[in-house]
Curated annotation (Swiss-Prot):
Catalyzes the attachment of glutamate to tRNA(Glu) in a two-step reaction: glutamate is first activated by ATP to form Glu-AMP and then transferred to the acceptor end of tRNA(Glu). It is found in: Cytoplasm. Keywords: Aminoacyl-tRNA synthetase, ATP-binding, Cytoplasm, Ligase, Nucleotide-binding, Protein biosynthesis. SUPFAM superfamilies: An anticodon-binding domain of class I aminoacyl-tRNA synthetases (SSF48163), Nucleotidylyl transferase (SSF52374). Its EC number is 6.1.1.17. ATP binds at residue 246. PROSITE patterns: AA_TRNA_LIGASE_I. It comes from the Bacteria. One of its GO terms (molecular function) is glutamate-tRNA ligase activity. A motif ('KMSKS' region) lies at residues 243-247. This is Glutamate--tRNA ligase.
Amino acid sequence: MVVTRIAPSPTGDPHVGTAYIALFNYAWARRNGGRFIVRIEDTDRARYVPGAEERILAALKWLGLSYDEGPDVGGPHGPYRQSERLPLYQKYAEELLKRGWAYRAFETPEELEQIRKEKGGYDGRARNIPPEEAEERARRGEPHVIRLKVPRPGTTEVKDELRGVVVYDNQEIPDVVLLKSDGYPTYHLANVVDDHLMGVTDVIRAEEWLVSTPIHVLLYRAFGWEAPRFYHMPLLRNPDKTKISKRKSHTSLDWYKAEGFLPEALRNYLCLMGFSMPDGREIFTLEEFIQAFTWERVSLGGPVFDLEKLRWMNGKYIREVLSLEEVAERVKPFLREAGLSWESEAYLRRAVELMRPRFDTLKEFPEKARYLFTEDYPVSEKAQRKLEEGLPLLKELYPRLRTQEEWTEAALEALLRGFAAEKGVKLGQVAQPLRAALTGSLETPGLFEILALLGKERALRRLERALA
């Protein structure tokens, strides 16, 4: 059975890169009828942010990436927080000492800094401490770390399923710390121990971890365990080809949710980061992605995460994928957040229908449609100028509108066209000032539709205010 996992660190906002890697882990597990695990790597206590774990899990659920095992759903391989598994890592670090694959190192932080200055990195000097002496010093409580003892000379072969075989000279592989002096493991030890104990068969992660993989391969060899298959995905890039980061891009999934991006659209867009459908389609469901997914269709070129392209895709989902009822339902929290209410479900649906071609995110709807829900809406400079130009015509139009009995789009269109013809002016010379009076904008859906939706009483009230 295929078992995949993601192991995010709760050190800040849920990252779009985490979602990208999670998506491919999820798809590969589902494609093969396997299991997808979420494990929280919270051993870096200095960078730990309270509440970050809950936000990561909430973001995965928002994106529709359900997992079979994890800290909040449990499972047969728990606990799923590394901070709750410390005795395990200590046990396996001791095992490596016994097997001759690790050693205790007692340098102080100051000594390590001096070694780095002189040698460019740790030089393995504690390898030469006799094991009996090291054990005695540890028993006395002398602070120390446990380091991997990389076999030298020699080479380590890493097979990456996307890139082929890479051979590393062991002289280039450092004796990394496996267990810190506070008893917490480093990423390398915890990662390998957990992947083995949780039965992970396929490790799908970002390409920045490729350089760590020879260390992990050596650890599997040291324990006598079979290594999983490794797939290192290309990193998401900014349009200028630099690695995506919060300095240049919006990387927080919470930001995308708050801005009114649809989880389906964001998920669809992330699928296209390094993957293409056999038929070249850009819009597809998660299920269609899973059915079409093969590693042969994953490209290693740096995929560009372009916010404008995502906005375009989000707009396509709003206009073409979701039903009118779904869009109306999803804009409600954004209307409430903007302090707006709606008189009926039918009114809201019609407002969304009229505005649908004009907004690309859910948050834009209350911004662009404010005049449909409140009398407190802004008036643009252009609209104000157009209103002032058209005041004489609007004063003559007002009594006609007030006595108009049939308040439908067709009847109102006939009235306005007839009025313009009677005055010998183009329809726009009447329609644009009226549009400005009713909405505060010149960029709106059709005027007749807006008149009908606002209703006679509200439309006349706004026109009276403009003429006052």
